[in-house]
Amino acid sequence: FEMQYCWSHSGVCRDKSERNNKPMAWTYCENRQKKCEF
């Protein structure tokens, strides 16, 4: 996957685009502007 902007929740970084109505879990994200790596 390429790096995408994400939003964090409970210390978990998730992708904005949801799959099967569930946010995809990514690596830890310290802020909403940070990009997540697969």
Swiss-Prot record:
Native source species: Ornithorhynchus anatinus (Duckbill platypus)
Keyword Disulfide bond: yes
Record-linked Pfam families: Defensin_3 (PF08131)
A GO term, aspect molecular function: toxin activity
Cellular localization per UniProt: Secreted
Disulfide bonds: 6-36, 13-29
Keyword Secreted: yes
Protein name: Defensin-like peptide 3
Keywords: Disulfide bond, Secreted, Toxin
Principal cellular location given in the protein's record: secreted
Function noted in UniProt: Does not show antimicrobial, myotoxic, hemolytic and cell-promoting activities.
Tissues of expression: Produced by the crural gland and detected in venom from the spur located on each male hind leg.
Cellular-component GO terms for this entry: extracellular region
InterPro entries: Defensin_3 (IPR012553), Myo_ane_neurotoxin_sf (IPR023355)
Superkingdom of origin: Eukaryota
